[in-house]
């Protein structure tokens, strides 16, 4: 079924019969308030309205119409695209917010089949280290394993293993040749922290594997020798990689994990569009980041467009995402600058005040519909406004390829910050990147207010708040994917691509929205995927 956006049911067309265009088409944008039209065969000057008469919609304004289905929810394919070059097993992304995504969240998202975007409210070195931690968290074969020299001390080995949360380190000489290995077992009863590793490491009968060893072959070697780490060496004895039993077990534990060609978890990271953004981009790329996100509040500004073009020219092979936009023109402008995905959403987030502070924005469903038209074949990321799993289904049905979530994930174990108790319940903090405190910590450039040091000189576009503690993010993702599967089953779509093209929406009234939620009862026990 060909489409430029999802179709709307007859009831919606009837409800909007007074409009002259469907809700996905823009009204004339002539800011001068005049234009040419043909009256009785002659051109005449006429005044054009500056107010678009078509109704802009958000998720609560519509429902998807059930359709004939031959697909069971458990059999649907939830894979989609994050960018032109990055696939997802589930179309869910964690937002680049400093109360949502650091390395713990990014690791959990990738293991579930999604991806996390590391926030940029940190130093360049720390953000690059966060990328490195995600990439090192698991691997088919670690291509550049952390190493030590035989002259290093037990103290240095302990510090290194604690820092990277690893249980062993290969020991190499000045030429990179493997001379031994040190593990937690070697150090468990070592009391002399200044003892050189040459006296503590295992050097005799080292078990190694040649370059080209498969993971299945490596597993057999590890099991045969009852060891946990297998150095990979070339014919000269030079260390070329490391295979661990932990990574092999994780491959079975997380079969849907989103990994790169080397078996490492995928991760994206945010940069700005001014200042040292190019230095930050280089550091992230050197650390192995899979995608760069130029993260701004207004992606259809010349500064952002220029920065996007600069990054694309400097790094033609990196997967590049930019935003945020809310119109077809904004999406088209970013695509013309070479992005691999467009991020959509101006003001829909629960912690965002952009629309009331500035008076600017587009309700998220309409923003997605229009941006998908402008982006063409380039994936669209729907950023913000997701309260329930059904909202994610609607965003994907509107044409988005993935959905970005912030506040929904802020209360999970993997989000930055500690949980706190209030009136007997556990909470975690969440704040918009446009909140006053976040802007003071480094996100002011996202709102084009960089350089302002005094809080009194900042104009925030977000708030700080708290959300209930939700436990592991895997529990939240399980419910989100379960709702997505059920939604796909109801509308008869076996794939995300079919969901993006086939279903119909119907516009609903406030009475219809009330009817959609639990009503006429007192909830005595909340469901894991629904709360008021």
Residue ranges of model-derived segments:
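Alpha/beta catalytic cores of nucleotide-metabolism and tRNA/nucleoside-modifying enzymes
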Residues: 8, 12-68, 148-149, 210, ...
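Catalytic beta/alpha-barrel core
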Residues: 118-121, 147, 168-170, 208-209, ...
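Active-site-adjacent beta->alpha loops and helix N-cap segments on the catalytic face
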Residues: 124-132, 238-258, 276-278, 297-317, ...
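Short beta->alpha transition motifs characteristic of CBS
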Residues: 118-123, 166, 170, 177-193, ...
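Bateman/CBS regulatory modules and CBS-like beta-alpha motifs in cytosolic regions of diverse proteins
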Residues: 76-88, 95-97, 126-164, 171-173, ...
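Short beta-strand/loop segments at the ligand-binding rim of alpha/beta enzyme cores
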Residues: 87-92, 141-145, 261-269, 311-326, ...
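Glycine-rich phosphate-binding active-site loops on the catalytic face of alpha/beta enzymes
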Residues: 114-126, 289-301, 343-358, 386-419
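Catalytic cores of alpha/beta
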Residues: 105-106, 279-284, 326-344, 387-401
